[in-house]
Amino acid sequence: MVLTDPPYNVDVEETAGKIKNDNMPDDKFYQFLFAAFVNMEQNMEQDASIYVFHADTQGLNFRKAFKDAGFYLSGCCIWKKNALVLGRSPYQWQHEPCLFGWKLNGRHQWYSDRKQTTIWEYDRPKASKEHPTMKPIALMAYPIQNSSMSHCIILDPFLGSGSTLMACQQTGRICYGIELDEKFVDVIVRRYISEYGDAGVFVLRGDEKIPYAEVADDGTD
């Protein structure tokens, strides 16, 4: 299963800093998304589902890249927040959409009942100094539990603040996460260690597996 929260191309800047690849020309952003979606599609099982959070203002790019990369779009779910996010629009945003689908020639697995809806109501986190667009862990855990079983692999190629990782840990899944920005990698590691300790955290350097505590002690994290 894939659960991810790519850059929205809205040039977000908060106290936690800017997000890489978040301010591109329209055509470049489409190509960026298309390449990412192709890689995801090629690394998914035939019966795996995919969930992609995005911004409505970039909905056309997300949907076109999603379908062009070989995904079937089953629907669009809505994260309804408990509070608005102040911006420049006449209508203030209080939701984020999430594409849901699977491989065009594949099928999908469903592990919940028939009462689940497209509206997901979860409180948004208070402003974080660690990451400008942190998702609540409970929000990420919801689709994970609907579309995967325990011990399944969940791929998040844009791991960001690490909410998918934390949700996988809580629900007994295995998270394969990728994060380009080093400062957010540090955020992910600190967030995980603060909750679960550093006993299972290692740095791989070539064939060497080094306990994170040793790396942190020598100041090279």
Question: At which residue positions do the language-model features occur?
Answer:
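Core catalytic lobe of class I
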Residues: 1-185
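S-adenosyl-L-methionine
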Residues: 189-221
